[in-house]
Amino acid sequence: SVCVETFVSGVHHKSMEVFVKVVGEDLTTGERYLAATCFTTFVAIPSHMNPESDFQLAAVVPETAEEKLICSNYETRRQQRLALREETKLFSQHLTTDLPWIDSPL
C-alpha cells in the first residue's frame, strides 16, 4: 500500500510550494519505505467574480522537525526554479515548431 502526505512548504505572495511524500508499505512484512518525494507549485489567482482583489497568502508555520527542515530551504528552491524558468525560456527561443517530415525540403 502507499500513503501520501502533503503540506505547504513555502509561500511567496500568491504562490505556494507543496511538499509531497509517498511512503510505501509491504503488506506482508509491514516494512515501510520512502517511495517518492516531490515539490509542486501552485499559483493563486483572483476570482473572476472579483479580479481586482488583492490578497497575500498566509505564512507557513512548520511544526515537526521534518517540516522545519523542508520549509527552511524554500527560498533556495524558489530561486532555483526562477533561474531554471529563465534558462528554459532562453532555450525554447532556439526551438522551432516546424515538422521535419512536412516542412523540410527533400
Q: What is each PLM-predicted segment?
A:
Residues S1-T6:
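Functionalized membrane-embedded alpha-helices
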Residues F7-L106:
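HotDog/MaoC-like acyl-thioester-processing domains
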